[in-house]
Amino acid sequence: MAAISINVSTVKPLGDRIFVKVSPAEEKTAGGILLPDNAQEKPQIGEVVAVGPGKRNDDGSRSELDVKVGDKVLYSKYAGTDVKLSGEDYVLLSEKDILASVA
């Protein structure tokens, strides 16, 4: 099977889905101890890089999403689908998995 090359800028989420670039995990503890990859906690914060058109309502209209491209968001720990593109980590989430917008 041939590998498919996908450019991040071409990803277009469907419905109420949001494509988020995951912030890097902390590599050191507060005391300065380096953590191995398997001991690092999965980050729950990232930057929105693409949003879907919104959830379709019963009347056929779409509900606008509360977040937009460029927003930093906090999301549920085990939510979404993890995606790796061009060596970077991303997660595809439903809007309901977003807990907060972070300034």
Curated annotation (Swiss-Prot):
Keyword Transferase carried by entry: no
Keywords from the UniProt entry: Chaperone, Cytoplasm
Annotated CDD domains: cpn10
Main location: cytoplasm
Gene Ontology MF, one: unfolded protein binding
Annotated GO CC locations: cytoplasm
GO biological process terms held by the UniProt record: chaperone cofactor-dependent protein refolding
Cellular localization per UniProt: Cytoplasm
Pfam families given in the database record: Cpn10 (PF00166)
InterPro entries in the cross-refs: Chaperonin_GroES (IPR020818), Chaperonin_GroES_sf (IPR037124), Chaprnonin_Cpn10_CS (IPR018369), GroES-like_sf (IPR011032)
UniProt-listed Gene3D superfamilies: GroES chaperonin
NCBIfam families hit by this protein: PRK00364.1-2 (NF001527), PRK00364.1-6 (NF001530), PRK00364.2-2 (NF001531), PRK00364.2-4 (NF001533), PRK00364.2-5 (NF001534)
Family: Belongs to the GroES chaperonin family.
Quaternary structure, from the entry: Heptamer of 7 subunits arranged in a ring. Interacts with the chaperonin GroEL.
Function in brief: Together with the chaperonin GroEL, plays an essential role in assisting protein folding. The GroEL-GroES system forms a nano-cage that allows encapsulation of the non-native substrate proteins and provides a physical environment optimized to promote and accelerate protein folding. GroES binds to the apical surface of the GroEL ring, thereby capping the opening of the GroEL channel.
Name listed for the protein in its UniProt record: Co-chaperonin GroES
Species annotation: Crocosphaera subtropica (strain ATCC 51142 / BH68) (Cyanothece sp. (strain ATCC 51142))
